């Protein structure tokens, strides 16, 4: 389409140039016609003069007296003719020079435009060739990617033709959703759990809820090979297989095999298209599943449910930490109470030691120190140090004071405190 537009534009420019040149040629022809008309008129004048000359020449025989006049007239006519010829030649040269310059000045922009158009056309063709090469390369890459996608799709189709592979695919999708939602495998859920009483009743995923409760999820992916391989397959067969699987889950009664499990099981459909096609074909499917204690779940709804469970676990962990902090505070209070008893005992013994020290100091000062000072007066000792009197200890140890009333603190840390109690099982 672009090449055709460019070709049409070039033809239009050429036609314009042809009409323009034709107009200039007609103008030159019209000017030349005027010039020829003037020249013809001059020739007529010359012929008239020559005719007059002939008449005069004929009269010259009879009128010899007029020979000199005729000769002068002849010279005058010759000079006039030559001057007229020179003037006409000069005017013709100037006229054609002006017209040539005018035509050149008019055609110069057209020439420049055509040159620029030619250059742009060459650049466009070069760019178009490069674009065609790039487009060819992109189409080749797209074809390669499409072939690769087709091979991978075919491989996935071949794998999912087997019921076991479809079940495993559903479990992998479910584990991925559990990982994204924060339900880590080592603490919040377990896979392939088998009840000890009946080994045939195996749950794909058992979500552990707070207070030792459980939530069972099944991911057996009930859809047929025809639904997988045919894009225009009738979803009626899909609905039938889902209903059959709902009946199977109802007979298994997972809620009876796991302690404190809700009386329902979640049937996970590992694709929004599966869920939407089934509900679009059978809007009553949700009610049918609910009557069998089965809840249908797509990846989006299961993600929201697991996010809620994650939040519940966070709240449960927070409550456990609060209870643990309360228990630690209670233990700390009891230990500090014991420590304060030891402080009181130490203070009491320190007070007794101070009294004993003061009694001993008084006894030494009253009975022993006077005798020792008598020895100092007798200079019996070679030491120049004198025995100083013992000082009394007047400061007694103080008992530490509890910053809060003992009864209030004991009440806050008592086992009956509300935040130290675990939530009741019926909440």
Swiss-Prot record:
Disulfide bonds: none annotated. It comes from the Bacteria. GO terms for biological process: DNA recombination. The keyword Coiled coil applies. Keywords: Coiled coil, DNA recombination. The keyword Coiled coil applies. Residues 112-162 form a coiled coil. Signal peptide: none annotated. Belongs to the RmuC family. Involved in DNA recombination. This is DNA recombination protein RmuC homolog. It comes from Chlamydia trachomatis serovar D (strain ATCC VR-885 / DSM 19411 / UW-3/Cx).
């Amino acid at each position: 389409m672009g090449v055709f537009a460019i070709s049409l534009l070039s033809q239009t420019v050429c036609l314009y140039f042809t009409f323009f040149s034709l107009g200039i040629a007609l103008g030159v022809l019209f000017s030349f016609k005027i010039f020829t008309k003037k020249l013809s008129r001059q020739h007529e004048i010359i012929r008239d003069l020559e005719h007059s000359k002939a008449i005069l020449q004929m009269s010259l025989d009879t009128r010899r007296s007029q020979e000199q006049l005729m000769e002068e007239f002849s010279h005058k006519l010759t000079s006039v003719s030559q001057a007229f010829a020179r003037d006409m030649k000069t005017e013709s040269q100037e006229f054609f020079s002006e017209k040539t310059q005018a035509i050149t000045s008019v055609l110069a922009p057209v020439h420049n435009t055509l040159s620029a158009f030619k250059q742009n056309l060459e650049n466009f063709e070069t760019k178009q060739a490069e674009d065609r090469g790039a487009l060819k390369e992109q189409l080749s890459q797209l074809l390669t990617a499409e072939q690769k996608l087709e091979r991978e799709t075919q491989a996935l189709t071949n794998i999912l033709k087997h019921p076991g592979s479809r079940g495993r695919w559903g479990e992998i999708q479910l584990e991925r959703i559990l990982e994204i939602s924060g339900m880590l495998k080592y603490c919040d859920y377990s896979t392939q759990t088998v009840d000890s009483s009946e080994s045939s009743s195996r749950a794909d995923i058992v979500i552990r809820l707070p207070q030792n409760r459980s939530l069972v999820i099944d991911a057996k992916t009930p859809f047929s090979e025809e639904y997988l391989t045919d894009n225009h397959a009738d979803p009626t067969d899909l609905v039938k297989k889902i209903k059959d699987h709902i009946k199977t889950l109802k007979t298994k009664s997972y809620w009876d095999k796991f302690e404190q499990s809700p009386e329902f099981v979640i049937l996970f459909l590992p694709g929004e298209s599966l869920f939407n096609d089934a509900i679009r074909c059978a809007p009553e499917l949700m009610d049918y599943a609910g009557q069998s204690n089965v809840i249908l779940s797509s990846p989006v709804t299961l993600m929201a449910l697991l996010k809620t469970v994650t939040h519940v676990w966070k709240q449960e962990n927070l409550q456990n930490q609060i209870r643990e902090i309360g228990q630690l505070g209670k233990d700390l209070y009891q230990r500090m109470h014991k420590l304060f008893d030891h402080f009181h005992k130490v203070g009491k013994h320190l007070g007794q030691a101070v009294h004993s020290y003061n009694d001993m100091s008084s006894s030494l000062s009253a009975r022993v120190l006077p005798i020792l000072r008598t020895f100092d007066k007798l200079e019996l000792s070679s030491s120049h140090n004198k025995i100083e009197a013992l000082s009394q200890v007047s400061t007694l140890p103080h008992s530490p004071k509890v910053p809060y009333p003992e009864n209030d603190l004991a009440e806050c840390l008592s086992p009956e405190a509300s935040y130290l109690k675990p939530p009741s099982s019926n909440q």
